[in-house]
Amino acid sequence: LPSEKAPGSQNGFDNSGRKGPIAWQQGNTVTQTVDAFRALAERYLSESDVVAAIEALNEPNIPGGVSEAGLRDYYNQIVDVVRQINPDTSVFLSDGFLSTEAWNGFKTGDDVVMDTHHYVMFDNHLISLDINGHVKSTCDFGKQIKGSDKPVVVGEWTGAVTDCTKHLNGKDVPTRYQGEYANNPKYGDCGDRSQGSVADLSDQERTNTRRFIEAQLDAYEGKNGWLFWTWKTEGAPGWDMQDLLANGVFPSPLTDRKFPNQCA
């Protein structure tokens, strides 16, 4: 069960409920968040056959200005709340856009799980890579998370390698991939990547997407697992797991690999 939004915005992203400056940790916003979290936990954590874990807060943005010390204090409060309500529930802690190893020694052995999100389209270097580069980068990331002293779940990832999906960067915000965003260089044309089905992509692009997905499965299962983002969307090639499965681009069963041992 994720906690996507906090008063004031914990990351400045539109999916926090408010796009713009980060104001979480100002005034009484942390207290409000703890109170809201407690109400959520009291409502759902008794349903242990449904909710096995709960996240303290989605994507607090430390590089963007969230205080790391303040976030650690908030995490301590949240773990205490969960232990009071249902001590058998695991608590997911976002890495705050730091490396998972940066959290070594914090709450280790206290039934907490590090949650890291891995996207390539928001990074100017990663978005420029070809499929071989994406596979190598993914496998390198899989090796990196093994350095954590706690369980690590890659709680968000996708099959897309560009930011071409409509409104991905925000409503009516242009793309990095086509060189329209913040003076980025142009890496290519979006074409059919903006909306629709993965079936509309070329055979080569579908093959590359399958290869990228399989590399991520190998990398993330080398630690403690993953959650794909997302199960169903309104026409976003690479992001829609139902669509990927229906078109043979996501392995089914998961052991059905066309590109085995890419991270060996």
Q: Over which residues does each language-model region extend?
A:
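Acidic carboxylate-rich catalytic motifs and surrounding loops in phosphoryl-/glycosyl-chemistry enzymes
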Residues: 3, 54, 93-97, 224-235
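Aromatic- and acidic-residue-enriched segments that line the glycan-binding/catalytic groove
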Residues: 6-25, 168-179, 244
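Extracellular glycoside hydrolase catalytic/binding regions
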Residues: 46, 52, 59-214
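Aromatic-rich peripheral "rim/lid" segments of glycoside hydrolase catalytic domains that contact
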Residues: 191-264
